[in-house]
Amino acid sequence: MLNSAYIDLNQLRQNVNNVRKNLSKITRFCAVVKADAYGHGAPKVANAIYSRVDCFAVALLEEGKELRNSGIDKDILILTPLAFSDISTAVFYNFILSVDNFKTLKMIESECAKQNRKARIHLKFNTGMNRLGVNSLKELNQLSQHVQRSQYLILDGMFSHLGNPENKKDTKTAQNKFLLANNLIKGYNNKAICHLSASGGYLQNIGGDMVRIGILLYGYKPFKSNFVNVKPIMKVYAPLIKTRTIKADEHCLYGQKRADKTERVSLVRCGYADGFARQEKSFLFNNRCMDISAVKRANNTNRGVLIMDNADLLAKQYGTISYEVLVNSTKRAEKIYLQ
C-alpha cells in the first residue's frame, strides 16, 4: 500500500500565472524542476506549465534527460557542475551548461568538436554564497574570452545565487558584484542572459534577464512575503490499516509514552521511510515506525488519512524547511494528478 499524493495542476498553473504578473514582459521565466520538481513529479509538472514558462532548470544530467524523454523541447539549464563522464551526453542533448572552471570548459569544447555541435554556456559567478562560481571578475573575464574565441562554445549567459535574500545588506552587496559581472558579460554578448534571482530574489523584486522560480511554483515561500499569492498544490494521504483500543497505561509502537486513559488509535501506513519525521508533535500517539504511525485523531476519507497539506507546518515541527519536507514526502507515494 502506497501513500497517495494528490497534486493540483490547476493550482500549479495559477501559481505560475501569479508569479508571472510581477515580471516585466522581457524577463524570462525559468521553472526549476530539480529533485523531481521538489517531489511533485518533474515530467508532469513541466508539461503542465510548458506554455507558461520560457525554460526549465534541473540539477542533474539525469533530470534533464527525463524531461527531454517526456517531450520537453524547451531550453533546459543544468545548474550544477557536470561529472566529466556526463559531458558527452549533455552536449548531445543540447542542454545549457553551467561552468566555473577551465578544465570543464575545455572538456566541453573537446566533446563539441567530436560531435560537431555547439554548446551554450552559462558561467557561474560567486557573489557571496561561496558555494559555486568563480570569485573574481578577472577569472570571469578569462573564461568569457575563451568561450567567445571558441568555434564550439556560445556565451549564452552568466548567473549567480543569493545566499541570504532576506538580508538587505547581503543582497545589496551581491547585487553590486553581479552588476559588474553583468556588464562584463554584456560586453562580449549583449544578448547574454544574466540571472541572479531565484524565488527569494524574486520576492525582493530583484529582476534581471531571467528569474529561476522553484519553491513558489509549488505554493511555498522561502520567507514571509506579500509580494505574490501562491498556494500549496499537493496533499498527501496514507492508507488506514486498522483502528485499535489502547488501554490506560499501555503503549503503542516504539517509545515510552503510555495512554493516560483508554483511547482509540488508528494505525496508518506511513512511516519515516516515507519521508515523515519519527517525532511529530501534532497528532501521533508515539514515535513513528519505519512504515507505520499511530494516529490519535484520524479522519479517514476516501483518499485515506490526510498526513500533509502544508509543508511549512510540518517543517516547523521538524525543525527544518518546507523544501526538505516536500522532496521527501513522496518517496513512497503514488502521484495522482488533478487536471
Residue map of PLM features:
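Short secondary-structure boundary segments
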Residues: 60, 101-102, 125, 162, ...
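A charged N-terminal "starter" segment
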Residues: 1-96, 109, 154, 336-339
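Short hydrophobic/aromatic-enriched beta-strand-loop microsegments
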Residues: 73-82, 96-100, 118-124, 211-212
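Active-site loop/helix belt of alpha/beta enzymes
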Residues: 21, 35-48, 91-93, 105-111, ...
